[in-house]
Swiss-Prot record:
Designated name of the protein: 2-dehydro-3-deoxyphosphooctonate aldolase
UniProt xrefs under SUPFAM superfamilies: Aldolase
Originating gene: kdsA
Species the sequence originates in: Polaromonas naphthalenivorans (strain CJ2)
Substrates-to-products reaction catalysed: D-arabinose 5-phosphate + phosphoenolpyruvate + H2O = 3-deoxy-alpha-D-manno-2-octulosonate-8-phosphate + phosphate
InterPro entries per the UniProt record, alphabetical: Aldolase_TIM (IPR013785), DAHP1/KDSA (IPR006218), KDO8P_synthase (IPR006269)
Family per record: Belongs to the KdsA family.
Gene3D superfamilies: Aldolase class I
Compartments where located: Cytoplasm
Length: 285
């Protein structure tokens, strides 16, 4: 699959989707995006900058949601224009899709909305590539139905069907906890869509701080290494220069100062995995 001018897949080095959880300020976006651009360029990693103009599913009604669509898109457009980076952001309703698709390069669907058929159809018919997140409540094999819905909607409009990615972000495990079953990454290959692993939301503790979600950022490298060893097309990681003071999802954000070292390790694992191939494909059921 072609994405933002580069090839992605299990036979290609992993690409990276990264950035702050939410648009906090223009300066933070520009500084973080600039640093990530330098890091990924030095390592040869295809990179898409990510941030959200609105966090519509915060734990509490008093939590910071972002600057809103108009201002948020203006800031993301500036990052794209001045730094020359492709942009990904999430959309939360059908009404937003046209305006957002006119600015960004890749759309993302929130995990909670993966079963909303009309929403998936509308996003699929935007003409943009879409990173479709698997719901925390969904079995990995069920993502085939979600991707099939998106492809059918694209066909209706005569659009390219190979624009969809399947993203794993953990599964609910009791209350206020998520676990990552690494088998999911192999099972989701059955969708025939590139598989992306969200290493930061997978360590989230939903609602774990009462009015906001907690997280175990120290486990991000652990799960990221495991996912890359399984074999994935892309990696999603939220990052922030000061996670302790981030306005959203700080507890599970990678400190920006550690991103390069983490990516260097992941690149080594990725090369080994993809050089040696996938033995599981030779095993009979």
């Amino acid at each position: 699959m072609k994405l933002c001018g580069f090839d992605i897949g299990l036979d290609q080095p992993f690409f990276l989707i990264a950035g702050p959880c939410v648009v906090e300020s223009e300066q933070l976006q520009m500084d973080t995006a600039g640093t990530l651009k330098e890091i990924t360029a030095s390592l040869g990693i295809p990179f898409i900058f990510k941030s959200s103009y609105d966090k519509a599913n915060r734990s509490s009604g008093t939590s910071f949601r972002g600057p809103g669509m108009e201002k948020g898109l203006q800031i993301l457009a500036k990052v794209k224009r001045e730094l020359g980076l492709p942009i990904l952001t999430d959309v939360h309703s059908e009404a937003e899709i046209t305006a957002v698709a006119a600015v960004v390069d890749v759309l993302q669907t929130p995990a909670f909305l993966c079963r909303q058929t009309d929403f998936i159809h509308a996003v699929a018919q935007s003409g943009r590539p879409v990173n479709i997140k698997k719901g925390q409540f969904l079995a990995p094999g069920d993502m085939k139905n979600v991707i099939d819905k998106a492809r059918a909607a694209a066909r209706e409009k005569g659009l390219d069907e190979d624009r969809f990615m399947a993203c794993e972000r953990g599964a609910s495990f009791g209350y206020n906890n998520l676990v990552s079953d690494m088998r999911s990454l192999a099972i989701m290959r059955e969708t025939r869509a590139p598989v992306v692993f969200d290493a930061t939301h997978s360590v989230q503790l939903p609602g774990g701080m009462g009015t906001s979600s907690g997280g175990q950022r120290e486990m991000v490298p652990v799960l990221a290494r495991a996912a890359v060893a399984v074999g994935i097309a892309g990696l999603f990681m939220e990052t922030h220069p000061d996670p302790a003071n981030a306005m959203s999802d700080g507890p599970n954000a990678v400190p920006l100062k550690h991103m390069k070292a983490l990516l260097e390790t992941l690149l080594e694992l990725d090369r080994v995995t993809k050089k040696n191939g996938y033995l599981e494909n030779s095993f009979s059921a």
